[in-house]
Amino acid sequence: MTNWNYQQTNFVTSAPDIRHLPPDTGIEVAFAGRSNAGKSSALNTLTNQRSLARTSKTPGRTQLINLFEVAEGKRLVDLPGYGYAEVPEEVKLKWQKALGEYLEKRQCLKGLVVLMDIRHPLKDLDQQMIHWAVASEIPVLVLLTKSDKLASGARKAQLKMVREAALAFNGDVQIETFSSLKKQGVDVLRQKLDSWYNGLEPAVEAEE
């Protein structure tokens, strides 16, 4: 199995919708989550690049579909954050349309990483995203981000609760904790991405 070097990931393009994306070939893994769930921080931690994906304390800064190339034909996709964002309704609807089109029509999408703040997991939109992926037979890795915000006992309890709740999705849904600050969960994320890029069977969940 090839272990991809995520530190060599480079920015390719930003697109307002799928019509402006590169050809629908190769393998793409998309990162999705509510605004301020820590998507950009996770991408920067994964690639060990401080500013590959722009981070912001203002929710909703990721307004475009941002593509990054890990290796030829292997791409990471930073999708527009969903949920809360201080933007006009018209703009929000445009993001949602772009997000929906990408998820429904992009044939090279082979894995979905859904990021949720460990303190506020499984909001309605998060569950919709996972239900959609399961219905489309796309495997999901849920990262419970900002896990450093909780003490060890509370963190383990949240992980157990979300894993039990995720059984209801009846799909290939793996749940792990993640902290960009402490670099916790990065190896599990890399292993999962490696398996998707190599077209392998799902792995067993890691222990906390």
UniProtKB/Swiss-Prot annotation:
Mg(2+) binds at S40, T62. The keyword GTP-binding applies. It comes from the Bacteria. Residues 25-199 form the EngB-type G domain. One of its GO terms (cellular component) is cytosol. GO terms for molecular function: GTP binding; metal ion binding. Keywords: Cell cycle, Cell division, GTP-binding, Magnesium, Metal-binding, Nucleotide-binding, Septation. Pfam families: MMR_HSR1. Necessary for normal cell division and for the maintenance of normal septation. Belongs to the TRAFAC class TrmE-Era-EngA-EngB-Septin-like GTPase superfamily. EngB GTPase family. This is Probable GTP-binding protein EngB. It comes from Enterobacter sp. (strain 638). The gene is engB.
